[in-house]
Structure formats: C-alpha cells, structure tokens
Amino acid sequence: MHGDTPTLHEYMLDLQPETTDLYCYEQLNDSSEEEDEIDGPAGQAEPDRAHYNIVTFCCKCDSTLRLCVQSTHVDIRTLEDLLMGTLGIVCPICSQKP
C-alpha cells in the first residue's frame, strides 16, 4: 500500500481455487477385535506394524524371558490372548531338556 488511503486494487489478490481431496483415509480404533480394511488412494493400505517388547516367564523354570516382535495392533492382542491362555514359552535351557 502506497499513500495515506488504501485503494481496492491493492487488496485484490489473484487467487485460484485449488482442488482438495476431502476423503479421510484415517483408521479409527474399533472396540471390536475385527480388523477393518482401509481403501486408500493406491488401493488397500497396509496395517501399521510396530515393535513390541514382551517380558514373560519360562513355563518350566520361571526364568524371565524377553522377546521383541514386530506386529500389528490386532495381532499383538491375539498373541496376548494366547499367552494369557494355555500357550507357554520355554527358555533355551529348558528346551534342551527332555
């Protein structure tokens, strides 16, 4: 702006409308254990995988075992259900014993 009073042509901007994709590809956590499929711009999106540290005990000698796994959120819940049930993990020493 030049001068003491603004003029209209100084405020006229040369703006062009832009096209924007308004579809949200965000996946929300569902309270059920079913995994929903996401349709993304390139088809179906891969579920996010993360690293999980698991600390458990040997089912024979009760020594502490540490595991690091890479899994989806749904699959790690399945593993948790198995570990809380009848599935037991054996340490390397106990696995050598008959």
Curated annotation (Swiss-Prot):
unnamed ZnF: 58-94
Q: Does the keyword Metal-binding feature in the UniProt annotation?
A: yes
Intervals of motif Nuclear export signal? 76-84
Q: Which positions does the motif LXCXE motif occupy?
A: 22-26
Q: Which InterPro entries match?
A: Papilloma_E7
Positions of region (E7 terminal domain): 1-40
Per the UniProt entry, the effect of residue 91 to G is:
Complete loss of interaction with HDAC1 and transformation ability
Name the UniProt key words of this record, in alphabetical order: Activator, DNA-binding, Early protein, G1/S host cell cycle checkpoint dysregulation by virus, Host cytoplasm, Host nucleus, Host-virus interaction, Inhibition of host innate immune response by virus, Inhibition of host interferon signaling pathway by virus, Interferon antiviral system evasion, Metal-binding, Modulation of host cell cycle by virus, Oncogene, Transcription, Transcription regulation, Viral immunoevasion, Zinc, Zinc-finger
Q: Name one Pfam family in it.
A: E7
Q: Give the source's domain of life in one word.
A: Viruses
Query: Per the record, what is the consequence of mutating residue 67 to R?
Result: Complete loss of interaction with HDAC1 and transformation ability
Assembly and oligomerization:
Homodimer. Homooligomer. Interacts with host RB1; this interaction induces dissociation of RB1-E2F1 complex thereby disrupting RB1 activity. Interacts with host EP300; this interaction represses EP300 transcriptional activity. Forms a complex with CHD4 and HDAC1, thereby altering the action of host histone deacetylation. A similar complex involving E7, CHD4 and HDAC2 may also form. Interacts with protein E2; this interaction inhibits E7 oncogenic activity.
Family statement: Belongs to the papillomaviridae E7 protein family.
Additional facts recorded: HPV16, in comparison to HPV types 6 and 11, is more often associated with malignant genital cancers in humans.
Q: What is known of its domains?
A: The E7 terminal domain is an intrinsically disordered domain, whose flexibility and conformational transitions confer target adaptability to the oncoprotein. It allows adaptation to a variety of protein targets and exposes the PEST degradation sequence that regulates its turnover in the cell.
Quote the protein name from its UniProt record. Protein E7
Lineage, highest ranks first? Viruses, Monodnaviria, Shotokuvirae, Cossaviricota, Papovaviricetes
Q: Which gene encodes it?
A: E7
